[in-house]
Each structure stands twice: as C-alpha cells, then as structure tokens.
C-alpha cells in the first residue's frame, strides 16, 4: 500500500514539474514581441539580395545580432522600395526601419531615433574614373549631381545651394540602386555623393568604373528609426548596440560588409 502511494506521489511530482516547464515556455513565447523591420533590397552592402536571393548586408546582420541580444523580441524583415519605408513606418505597417537612415529635422518631427549610432557613412563626391576635373564642391558648380530624393546627400546639396546661389544642378534618381551609377556612366549626370563601400560594390558587381574624390563631405551618423510610441524598443536597441560595440561585433560586421571599420566616425580615426 505504501509503495502504491509512493508511486502516485512520484508521478504527481513529475506531472507538476512537467506542467511547470510547459507554462514557463509558453509564457516566454507569449512575452516575445514581434517587431517588423522594414528594409530594402537594393542598397549595396547594406540591405540587398545576394546571389542566392537571400536578404543580407550590414544593416540586416546588425539587426540579427540585436535580435539575439533581446530575447523579449522576435524580429521579422519586410522588404519594400526605399520610397515606401517612411510611409509604412508612419502607417505602422512596420515597427522599425533598417536602411542606413540618417537624422534630419523633418524626420525627427515624425519619428523616433535611438541614441547610439551603429554606423557612420562617410560621403564623398563620386565621379567616373576618367574624370580628373572634379575634386571639390566648387568643381561641381554648373554640373549635375544626382542623389536620392529623400537622402542625406540631397539635403546636403540643397543646403549648399541655398547659401551659394544654387550653382549645382540637383537631379533625383529613379528606382533601383543602379540608376544613379548608370546616369553617371552614361554622362546624364556628372557626379553623386556616395560612400566608398557603395562605389566599390557597384564597380565589382556591375562593371562600372567610378571613384570617390576629395575629402569627406559628410560623416553621417546612422540610426534605426521607430515610431514615436516605441521608446522602450528604442532604448532596448541602444543597450544591444552598446554591447555589440563593446564585444567587437559591430567592427567585425563593418569590416566584412563595408571593407573597413565604420562603427567609428572618420573624424575620430
């Protein structure tokens, strides 16, 4: 009789332990908040499709590393044209943008940034390899510069034109990352403002012959963008970025995807 009671008690203990484990796992699953990460597929080395059609690049891999550091979230990527990213964030179709985004006053009015930049984008004047006349902004007077319509480069040239009598003809690129390079290659534009890693990627993958010239015009701090109500997510992202910077992950990913360590400002090096 005692043996039977002991067996029943033992089975009851196992059942309780099993039930407890199941509840803990389910609770963890329920607590994990799904975060939709909006990004593009045409940004060389940053967010693009590789030869296997897989989404990858510096921003993508940094986001995956952040996801591993934050068990309370599950990140899912949603791709779209760059021109639709801000609208989708504003409409809450996505929760965060990962696409080499810089701050500007207009964006800060509508959206939220975390505090610690995860990358810096040094921007240079970019021309064809056989162009030996353009080296500075003054050399661009009377020339056509092509940039993305909502890019930091567009904002920079627009401000320059306002204070210098609009000497540079500003032209906006169409869809796709190749449009800018194609227009420079064919002579429809004289220059653009780009990063060395983007130029190198285009030269290797599309046989363009272009180069960066002169000094760094901008060394833009790069952030992820959130909706105004996502302060907790932004703060958690900051903590993860600090850890990734400290343990060398950002430097490692930057060197792998961008060819150098851009986790620090060029002006600090």
UniProtKB/Swiss-Prot annotation:
Task: Tell me the membrane topology, using the record's own terms.
Answer: Lipid-anchor
- List, in alphabetical order, the GO biological process terms annotated in this UniProt record: amino acid transport
On the tree of life, the source organism's domain of life is Bacteria
Enumerate the subcellular locations listed in this protein's record, separating them with semicolons. Answer: Cell membrane
Any GO CC annotation of this UniProt entry: plasma membrane
Q: Where is the lipid attached (N-palmitoyl cysteine)?
A: 21
- Quote the InterPro entries the UniProt record gives: Solute-binding_3/MltF_N
Where does lipidation (S-diacylglycerol cysteine) occur on this chain?
A: 21
What switches on expression, per the entry, is described as: More strongly expressed in the presence of methionine than in the presence of sulfate.
- Give the chief site where it resides: membrane
Query: Which stretch is the leader sequence?
Result: 1-20
Cross-referenced Pfam families, in alphabetical order?
SBP_bac_3
Tell me the keywords, alphabetical order: Amino-acid transport, Cell membrane, Lipoprotein, Membrane, Palmitate, Signal, Transport
Q: What does this protein do?
A: Part of the ABC transporter complex TcyJKLMN involved in L-cystine import. Is also involved in cystathionine, djenkolate, and S-methylcysteine transport.
Self-association and partners: The complex is composed of two ATP-binding proteins (TcyN), two transmembrane proteins (TcyL and TcyM) and two solute-binding proteins (TcyJ and TcyK).
The family classification in the record reads: Belongs to the bacterial solute-binding protein 3 family.
Protein name, entry field: L-cystine-binding protein TcyJ
Source species of the chain: Bacillus subtilis (strain 168)
């Amino acid at each position: 009789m005692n043996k039977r009671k002991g067996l029943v008690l033992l089975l009851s203990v196992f059942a309780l332990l099993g039930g407890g484990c199941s509840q803990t796992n389910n609770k963890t699953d329920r607590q994990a908040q799904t975060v939709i990460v909006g990004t593009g597929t045409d940004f060389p080395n940053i967010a693009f499709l590789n030869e296997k059609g897989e989404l990858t690049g510096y921003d993508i891999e940094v986001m995956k590393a952040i996801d591993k550091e934050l068990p309370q979230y599950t990140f899912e990527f949603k791709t779209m044209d760059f021109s639709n990213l801000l609208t989708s964030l504003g409409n809450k179709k996505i929760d965060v943008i990962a696409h080499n985004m810089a701050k500007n006053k207009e964006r800060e009015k509508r959206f939220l940034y975390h505090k610690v930049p995860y990358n810096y984008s040094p921007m240079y004047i970019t021309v064809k390899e056989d162009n030996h006349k353009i080296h500075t902004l003054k050399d661009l007077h009377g020339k056509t510069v092509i940039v993305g319509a909502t890019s930091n480069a567009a904002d920079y040239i627009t401000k320059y034109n306002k204070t210098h009598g609009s000497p540079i003809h500003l032209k906006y690129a169409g869809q796709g990352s190749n449009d800018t390079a194609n227009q420079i290659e064919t002579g429809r534009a004289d220059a653009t403002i780009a990063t060395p890693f983007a130029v190198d990627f285009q030269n290797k993958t599309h046989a363009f012959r272009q180069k960066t010239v002169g000094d760094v015009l901008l060394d833009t701090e790069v952030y992820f963008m959130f909706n105004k109500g996502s302060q907790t997510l932004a703060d958690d992202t900051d903590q993860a970025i600090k850890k990734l910077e400290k343990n060398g992950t950002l430097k490692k990913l930057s060197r792998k995807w961008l060819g150098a360590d851009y986790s620090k400002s060029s002006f600090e090096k």
